[in-house]
């Protein structure tokens, strides 16, 4: 018999768009020429297709020969991964358990998203993954308004043939100036069950501080009819391995805008943390973290230790060159 949480996964998966094809198709595949095959895996049906790189080669590699305008470019042996917890939400402000309830950002949260965008404005972004919740999507969209490449983030709609057809971009040049955004429920916040909508302070007074602390901070203990951090990690990490890591391996620079618990789960995987270590990990709203994926390994290059870009990120040579080319382009 399915557990209540398993059933909630199925319910969420049935109503939330999965954007079920490789985002790398966005730039070059014509609408009627996308070969697909379907496979069932971990709560979802995923459509896969032949991969086409979306990496921004304008600043990352030399221009192709004028005599060979479609000459393929050598893929980079490293890729940037940016993690951003969404800005403050209206329920963060009210000190309510939010979980999978879909609430927007506060004005402060909007400002945090914009400031996050300023910090990553010199880091290449080819592809964005968000949860299916509006606070994460708002954070991603607002952050990208600050990026120096001025590419436009576009949420992919592939939940139906009509949705895909109606949202198709027919200009190849416009597609080149866009960034695909994939929303996935697997990156949603931990589902807090019967705590969702309750005031955190009042809940502690009702059930006891120790009990609420176990529900919130333990790895294996779920709140009533909700998810434990372990259950959240199972879906978030599986999605990361199946969908995001292959994009990084292809040289695509990825940003993930998600939530405290889904991002803690992913960081546990990236940093090889124990179940005890991850319970003490805190992520600030609207502060981007930077990793470099190179030769199959993740290297942490930034943590929230300063308010300026220089105080947050240790650039690799490749990222430094990217910024230099942005600076040079700005002077033309």
Curated annotation (Swiss-Prot):
Residues 1-48 form a transit peptide. It catalyses: (2R)-2-phosphoglycerate = (2R)-3-phosphoglycerate. The keyword Cytoplasm does not apply. Substrate binds at residues 85-92, 98-99, 135, 189-192, 200, 216-217, 260-261. It holds the Pfam family His_Phos_1. Pathway: Carbohydrate degradation; glycolysis; pyruvate from D-glyceraldehyde 3-phosphate: step 3/5. Its main location: plastid. NCBIfam families: PRK01112.1. PANTHER family: PHOSPHOGLYCERATE MUTASE. This is 2,3-bisphosphoglycerate-dependent phosphoglycerate mutase 2.
